[in-house]
Amino acid sequence: MDPKNKVALLTGGARIGQAVAHSLALLGCNLALVYRGSRDAAEATAQAAIREGVRAITIQADATDEDQIARAVQETDRELGGIHILLNMASVYLETPEPKKVDWSNIVDANTRSVFLFSTAAAPIMKRSGAARIINFADWLPASGRPRYKGFVPYYTSKAAVVALTESLALELAPEVLVNVVAPGPILMPPGLSSAENDEVIDATPVRRWGGAEEIAKTVVFLVQSDFITGECIRVDGGRHLY
């Protein structure tokens, strides 16, 4: 599918979302940027897209609230004339050393249920276009088939569920909507990472570097433009899963 003159709805994503939005804008894709609290970042991303000659709007919505999700989808359709690409990037990354004491619903709602709600809300509009794409976001860890790190039980479980949900949606929404999932690995160095911790990540990554947000953007564009891939999980982790 050629993204030119199409409409993409993006949820969350922060720095990676900005790179994805920019790449789509360069290809002539109009954007609806859904944010919960980062209004300034969303507005800056929208203005950057507008400078590239496309339409871009921002919508404040909580990705765990079904009514707000429905409103965001309807506003995108009304203002931009459809939805051809849905990028479910909103996520919560939370360390939980004592998972029995954590409210799992907050993590599962943000990471998994939001994907289902946005996808099912947008699906009728997307099917109407005849050709559409849903791209979800998981994590290289659950995509690797083993957790590796202690203290992230709800997060790991919720992201593994996104992979399974992607496969289910791919079957349910075919042939009009192709549904895939991206599983990022060491893409952006977290703030506050020590030199020793950075070295540990690099040593455990075969390509010996952080990927950068542009690698995710290129993967998204590939999945948008591909016409015969659905129900697939693509790890973008520099080979991190091999260690």
Language-model-detected regions and their locations in the chain:
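Conserved glycine-rich Rossmann-like NAD(P)H-binding loop of the short-chain dehydrogenase/reductase
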Residues: 29-43
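Catalytic Tyr-X3-Lys loop
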Residues: 84, 100-117, 135, 155-158, ...
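Catalytic loop of short-chain dehydrogenase/reductase
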Residues: 92-96, 127, 133-161, 166-174, ...
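Conserved mid-core segment of classical short-chain dehydrogenase/reductases
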Residues: 70, 91-106, 146-154, 191-196
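Short, small/polar-rich loop/turn modules that mediate ligand/substrate recognition or access, typified
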Residues: 174-178, 230-231
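Canonical Rossmann dinucleotide-binding motif of NAD(H)/NADP(H)-dependent dehydrogenases/reductases
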Residues: 2-32
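Amphipathic alpha-helical dimer-interface segment in Rossmann-like NAD(P)H-dependent oxidoreductases
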Residues: 110-130, 170-175, 221, 225
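C-terminal substrate-recognition "lid" of short-chain dehydrogenase/reductases
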Residues: 209-236, 241
